[in-house]
């Protein structure tokens, strides 16, 4: 694109009237971002007839200091410093009419340690700007100076494993089904059977809070009774994610405190409670030595569409800053949205100390995490024991594998479903540790384990090779190609 700055300088810059954004200082192709700049990558789709550079400069302006006309009060500020600067515009491969806009923001534009303030600028009014057909925030580079103003995950992967005394394998969980309608007593029964059968965790679903069929306090009491009985029966540390999501912060704190009094080691919140509430609960969780699970309920309303919204990789970065310990991050092989390479990028953001740029995973920037704790990704939605070798290969061992229907839908009952998943996992971990090619030998390994485990045999028979093979709506724009040797 045009690599010449056309910024109007001097007194002409502040003459009353309307001026193109690219002439107001929001397009600076010669700008070299500072180490302390926040950098955002937007996918910009201008309306027909709108100059792409002007559209991208407008995004920079409207997400920082600009308004629709020149204002003389700009002269009362360090305007040159505080203007966001679009310094690079390039076409999106394979998407005619869309452009990547790289925009740098001075660190002083953002309140330290506040996701709400960051998002008010980056995804605020600019997303409704008329000259744009669509706008999507694809990725961000968050400088170390900014990262260090955040708490980060309240517990982190290492300490969570130490508390659970479980190492060297994925953790296993299940969401209680049906998610709505059970009484407290029957809900607790599901929790007990699943934990006794071999799972590490059970979990509330996103929309179970406090309804006429089951008050939250009743659910907490029955669930923790089940956890304690399962721990006594198995000799293992168990947990259940008690959803404390509620109408007000006061209600959420009350529920979290009650969970703590009952001896729970983990609570749960939903993404829909908002960024400030998430950070508040993360702060409470660290203070009270509680693992904090985040269900990403609602994210697909703005992460799933390729042209407009916010990429989940950005949400994952924000949530690592905010301080949650678990986040649902996709399964690749399950029923929910998840391109393999894109999902790997999400998992890397959660679990690495440093994320190098990997365009094939949709990661556009190097990202240093400045010693923030690692975030445990959670895989859930349409997975079952027959996919264990694929899940271990694709997602690694620092992950919670949530088999909801794949546990509770077992023909022999909940405990049998849990046992099937645990035996499948243990068989695959043993094969991996022995150096076997468990990815290609996976079906054979599972079949052999099933010879001495009736629940696993039945699980493999009923679900066989069930998969949800639909084309992903959000896949990387850059695909690695093999270069022939000279």
Curated annotation (Swiss-Prot):
RuBisCO catalyzes two reactions: the carboxylation of D-ribulose 1,5-bisphosphate, the primary event in carbon dioxide fixation, as well as the oxidative fragmentation of the pentose substrate. Both reactions occur simultaneously and in competition at the same active site. Transmembrane segments: none annotated. The active site is at 177 (proton acceptor), 295 (proton acceptor). PROSITE patterns: RUBISCO_LARGE. Gene3D superfamilies: Ribulose bisphosphate carboxylase, large subunit, C-terminal domain, RuBisCO large subunit, N-terminal domain. It catalyses: 2 (2R)-3-phosphoglycerate + 2 H(+) = D-ribulose 1,5-bisphosphate + CO2 + H2O; D-ribulose 1,5-bisphosphate + O2 = 2-phosphoglycolate + (2R)-3-phosphoglycerate + 2 H(+). Disulfide bonds: none annotated. The modification N6-carboxylysine is found at residue 203. This is Ribulose bisphosphate carboxylase large chain 1. Binds 1 Mg(2+) ion per subunit. It comes from the Bacteria. Substrate binds at residues 125, 175, 179, 296, 328, 380.
């Amino acid at each position: 694109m045009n690599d010449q700055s056309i910024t109007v300088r001097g007194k002409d810059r502040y003459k009353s009237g309307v001026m193109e954004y690219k002439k107001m200082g929001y397009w600076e192709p010669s700008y070299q971002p500072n180490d302390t700049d926040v950098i955002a990558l937007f996918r910009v789709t201008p309306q027909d007839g709108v100059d792409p550079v002007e559209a991208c400069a407008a995004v920079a302006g409207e997400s920082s200091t600009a308004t629709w006309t020149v204002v003389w009060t700009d002269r009362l500020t360090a305007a040159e410093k505080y203007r966001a600067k679009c310094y690079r515009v390039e076409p999106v491969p394979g998407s005619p009419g869309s452009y990547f806009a790289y925009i740098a923001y001075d660190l002083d534009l953002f309140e330290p340690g506040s996701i709400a303030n960051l998002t008010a600028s980056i995804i605020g009014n600019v997303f409704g700007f008329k000259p744009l057909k669509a706008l999507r925030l694809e990725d961000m580079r968050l400088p170390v100076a900014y990262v260090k103003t955040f708490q980060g995950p309240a517990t982190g992967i290492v300490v969570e494993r130490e508390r659970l005394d479980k190492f060297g394998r994925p953790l296993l969980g299940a969401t209680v089904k049906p998610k709505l309608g059970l009484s407290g007593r029957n809900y607790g029964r599901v929790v007990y059977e699943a934990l006794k059968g071999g799972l590490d965790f059970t979990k509330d679903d996103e929309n179970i809070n406090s309804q006429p069929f089951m008050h939250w306090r009743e659910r907490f009491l029955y669930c923790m009774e089940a956890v304690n009985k399962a721990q006594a029966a198995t000799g293992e540390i168990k947990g259940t994610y008690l959803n404390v999501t509620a109408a007000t912060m006061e209600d959420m704190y009350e529920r979290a405190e009650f969970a703590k009094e009952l001896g729970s080691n983990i609570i749960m919140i939903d993404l829909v409670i908002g960024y400030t509430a998430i950070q508040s609960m993360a702060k409470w969780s660290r203070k009270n030595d509680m693992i904090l699970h985040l269900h990403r309920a609602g994210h697909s309303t703005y992460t799933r569409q390729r042209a407009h919204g916010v990429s989940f990789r950005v949400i994952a970065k924000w949530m690592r800053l905010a301080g949650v310990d678990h986040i649902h991050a996709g399964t690749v092989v399950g029923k929910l949205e998840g391109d393999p390479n894109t999902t790997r990028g999400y998992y890397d953001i959660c679990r690495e100390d440093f994320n190098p740029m990997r365009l094939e995973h949709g990661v556009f920037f190097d990202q240093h995490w400045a010693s923030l704790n690692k975030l445990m990704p959670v895989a859930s939605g349409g997975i079952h024991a027959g996919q264990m070798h694929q899940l271990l290969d694709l997602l690694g061992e620092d992950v919670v594998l949530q088999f909801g229907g794949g546990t509770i839908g077992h023909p022999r009952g909940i405990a049998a479903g849990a046992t099937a998943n645990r035996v499948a996992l243990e068989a695959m971990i043993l094969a991996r540790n022995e150096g076997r090619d468990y990815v290609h030998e996976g079906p054979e390994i599972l079949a052999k384990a099933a010879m001495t485990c009736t629940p696993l045999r039945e699980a493999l028979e009923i679900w066989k090779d069930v998969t949800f093979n639909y084309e992903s709506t959000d896949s990387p724009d850059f695909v690695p190609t093999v270069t022939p040797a000279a």
